Amino acid sequence: MTTIVSVRRHGKVVMAGDGQVSLGNTVMKGNAKKVRRLYHGEVIAGFAGATADAFTLFERFEAQLEKHQGHLVRAAVELAKDWRTDRSLSRLEAMLAVANKDASLIITGNGDVVEPEDGLIAMGSGGAFAQAAARALLLKTDLSAREIAETSLHIAGDICVFTNHNITIEEQDLAD
C-alpha cells in the first residue's frame, strides 16, 4: 500500500505521498508518484491502494471535475455515486484524497466522501502513524503545512514497512 498525508495550514494546502509499490511482501518500485495535480493544476490528488485501480479513479475523477467545472465537492460526490453503483468500479481497491483551495476530501469505494474537520487527511497503510504525527505537530508547533506533511510521512516510513521515504509533495496557496 502507501501513505498519503494532506495538511491545510497558514494559507496553504499540501499533499504528500511516499513512492513505494508493493506486491504482497515484496517492494516492486520505490519511486512511484502517487500525488499529482488535476484539472488545470487547481486540484491536488493522491491515492492509496492498488495502483491500476487508482489510475482508473483518477481518470474518472478528472472527468467529473471537467463535467462540473472544477467544483471539487460535486465531482467527488458524483464519483462516489458511480463507484457505488457501477459494478466494474465497485471492485476497485483504492482510496483518493483530493484537495483544492476550498476543501480537502477523502473518497472511498464505499461511496463515502469525507471532509475532515481539521483539514488533515492521512490514509493508507501508514495513515494512522502519519495522522498521529501530523496532529501532534499541528497542535504543538508552528511548522508549515509542508514541513508537517513531510515530517509525518518520514515518521510513518520509519514505522510502516509498506511506506518509504521517497516523498512526492504538491503544494497550493489557498488564495489562488
From Swiss-Prot:
Which keywords, in A-to-Z order, does the entry hold?
Answer: Allosteric enzyme, Cytoplasm, Hydrolase, Metal-binding, Protease, Sodium, Threonine protease
- Keyword Coiled coil appears in the UniProt entry: no
Instruction: Give the principal location in a single coarse category.
Output: cytoplasm
Question: Its gene?
Answer: hslV
Q: Which GO terms describe its molecular function?
A: metal ion binding; threonine-type endopeptidase activity
InterPro entries, A to Z: ATP-dep_Prtase_HsIV_su, Ntn_hydrolases_N, Proteasome_sua/b, Proteasome_suB-type
Q: Which family does the record assign?
A: Belongs to the peptidase T1B family. HslV subfamily.
The listed locations are: Cytoplasm
Can you name this protein? ATP-dependent protease subunit HslV
